């Protein structure tokens, strides 16, 4: 099985102020041998990182396999977004693209983000929706 680790996990895992129990909860997912990255996730994480954090994150990301984002996935992301709108949900654009990448590669998205639940309800997206520990 291929896991696609979403931005929400990477942000909490790499943020210095995240509590240790949260990082320990996330660690098995980001360290899983089947964990993969996708370019939209890389973009989301690195665009918000400070320069010194970005260098460390790039080094870590370079150790992970990256799922490709073929150009036709943009159209699939649009279709997913339209399907979500039909059920009354507006989903962030990059989440739609991450879902399209996961569907293309038959990967399971691992995320704290509930936008993926809406996408999974209108598609064949495989999702492991996590809840942050209290």
Could you tell me what each predicted segment is?
Residues 1-37, 46-59, 134:
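Short, well-structured N-terminal submotif of metal-dependent ribonuclease cores
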Residues 6-7, 41, 112:
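A secondary-structure boundary/capping signal
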Residues 6-7, 45, 77, 102:
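Generic structural signal for small/hydrophobic residues in well-ordered secondary structure
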Residues 22-23, 42, 54-57, 74-77, ...:
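A general structural signal for well-ordered alpha-helical segments in protein cores
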Residues 36, 67, 128:
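General small-molecule cofactor/ligand-binding pocket signal
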Residues 39, 70, 131-133:
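Residues at the C-termini of beta-strands that transition into short coil/loop
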Residues 65-112:
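Active-site neighborhoods of divalent-metal-dependent phosphate/nucleic-acid chemistry enzymes
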